[in-house]
């Protein structure tokens, strides 16, 4: 009697786990594969580029972001495979730098594609890392809007701000070193655009 009850309970638990792990729509499966693949590509890129980094500040950013992304990857994959809450919840990435941008353009040499792999430098590496973070953020945003599994949707949606934060940190690094210049409109044009909209208070009843 007790053995039969145990077998039945075990079978029910197995069916429950299978139902959760298979609780995914077709669009979700395709978008999640693309998003996870994008995360892997970014991590692989960091591993390849790391030995070429010269600046210790950039090396610190690369290591910190890679280690955080590793945990994020495991959390996403676990929730995707099981359909359950992951054993390690989504973390929050904390930048280790300020958030001040330098505005304005300084003339410099025109940019052009590299002719030789030996031309790799910190400007190019930080650009590759920034592009990877932007790519992951875009893929996960698309995946979150197509996801039917509630756990996976929440985990992916909660991970997007971390990708944005990591991309922001890299853009600050690039701006600081003159790799990523930020132009501005004139003060008059800025005021015109800032005042182009106003708040409203007309809710539906």
PLM feature spans:
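Conserved alpha-helical segments that form or flank metal/cofactor-binding pockets of metalloenzymes
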Residues: 6, 56-104, 167-177
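Hydrophobic alpha-helical segments
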Residues: 69, 162-163, 192
């Amino acid at each position: 009697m007790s053995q039969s009850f145990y077998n039945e309970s075990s079978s029910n638990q197995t069916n429950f786990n299978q139902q959760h792990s298979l609780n995914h729509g077709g669009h979700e499966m395709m978008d999640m594969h693309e998003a996870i693949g994008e995360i892997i590509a970014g991590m692989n890129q960091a591993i390849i580029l790391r030995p070429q980094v010269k600046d210790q500040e950039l090396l610190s950013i690369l290591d910190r972001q890679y280690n955080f992304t590793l945990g994020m990857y495991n959390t996403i994959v676990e929730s995707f495979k099981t359909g359950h809450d992951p054993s390690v919840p989504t973390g929050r990435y904390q930048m280790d730098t300020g958030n001040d941008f330098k505005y304005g353009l300084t003339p410099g040499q025109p940019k052009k594609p590299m002719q030789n792999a030996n031309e790799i430098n910190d400007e190019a590496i930080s650009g590759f890392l920034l592009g990877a973070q932007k790519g992951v953020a875009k893929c996960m945003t698309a995946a979150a809007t197509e996801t039917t599994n509630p756990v996976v949707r929440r985990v992916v949606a909660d991970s997007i701000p971390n990708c944005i934060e990591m991309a922001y940190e890299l853009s600050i690094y690039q701006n600081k070193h003159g790799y990523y210049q930020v132009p501005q409109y004139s003060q008059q044009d800025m005021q015109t655009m800032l005042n182009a909209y106003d708040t409203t208070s007309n809710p539906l009843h």
